UniProtKB/Swiss-Prot annotation:
Family, as annotated: Belongs to the sirtuin family. Class III subfamily.
Annotated positions binding NAD(+): 20-39, 98-101, 186-188, 212-214, 230
Record's protein name: NAD-dependent protein deacylase
Function: NAD-dependent lysine deacetylase and desuccinylase that specifically removes acetyl and succinyl groups on target proteins. Modulates the activities of several proteins which are inactive in their acylated form.
Enzyme class: transferase
Binding site for Zn(2+): C124, C127, C146, C149
Cofactors demanded by this protein: Zn(2+)
Cofactor info, note text: Binds 1 zinc ion per subunit.
């Protein structure tokens, strides 16, 4: 790690990070994939789609409220706070997260885009109005309705088969094109978007550093692979970067 930083210290002008489910898992949040994602024998892929919502919006909302309840009991971990510290000290840093749990914001990240949305946002399917009003199965008929136009509300996340928000996507692409150092944190590459963004960064000349407990689809193309949990390895990496300013 030290040799890598010393050799490439002039590459630390513009630093970006992509975070995935691994950093949230360190806070105790299930990945909601595979066996962890099963709820009443439904898989995430069965419920997180426009078709599922159109067919049974009440069922989809019940699943998302179950997920919200789990996430609300969790707190940011050292990996989240290390990114906040990097943002505070480094003048040109930006974070792109796949995670919808809001823990990066809760930790204090400001230069952040939640490319898959935020599970605590409610968005109207007709007028697009968004809110963070608390929804409870005990007090709110499901699916909840928009106060502006009375259409159904849906969770403000990107579902399987949906397009990404144009502004968030275009901003992320431009950021990758002008990034010197990209940190890939806790994402396996099973979702195509982070792989796509990382490839843009690499093709544009960025150095790639991956932190993951196990090797992933990114590992063969990164410049440095650091095995371990983000919350354990990232603080050490950031200390090295900040101790060796460019």
């Amino acid at each position: 790690m030290k040799e890598f930083i010393t050799k490439h210290r002039d590459k630390f002008q513009k630093i970006s990070a992509i975070s995935g489910a691994g950093i949230s898992a360190e806070s105790g949040i299930p990945t909601f994939r595979g066996s962890e994602g099963l709820w009443k024998n439904f898989r995430a892929e069965d419920l997180a789609t426009p078709q599922a919502f159109s067919k049974n919006p009440k069922l989809v909302w019940e699943w998302y409220l179950w997920r919200r309840n789990i996430i609300e009991t969790k707190r940011p971990n050292p990996g989240h706070f290390a990114l906040v510290e990097l943002e505070r000290i480094h003048p040109d840093f930006f974070l792109i997260t796949q995670n919808v749990d809001g823990l990066h914001s809760q930790a204090g990240s400001k230069k952040l885009t939640e490319i898959h949305g935020n599970i605590f946002i409610n968005r109207c399917i007709s007028c697009g109005q968004e809110s963070k009003e608390t929804i409870s199965e005990n007090t709110t008929p499901l699916p909840p309705q928009c106060q502006n136009c009375n259409s159904f509300l849906r969770p403000g996340v990107v579902w399987f088969g949906e397009s990404y928000d144009d502004f968030k996507l275009n901003f992320s692409i431009q950021r990758m094109k002008h990034t010197d150092l990209l940190l890939v944190l806790g994402t396996s590459g099973s979702v195509s978007m982070p792989v796509y963004l990382a490839q843009i960064a690499k093709d544009s000349g960025a150095l790639l550093v991956e932190i993951n407990p196990e090797r992933s689809s990114f590992s063969s193309s990164v410049d440095l692979f650091l095995q371990g949990k983000t919350g354990e390895v990232l603080p050490e990496l950031i200390r090295e970067i900040l101790d060796n300013p460019s």
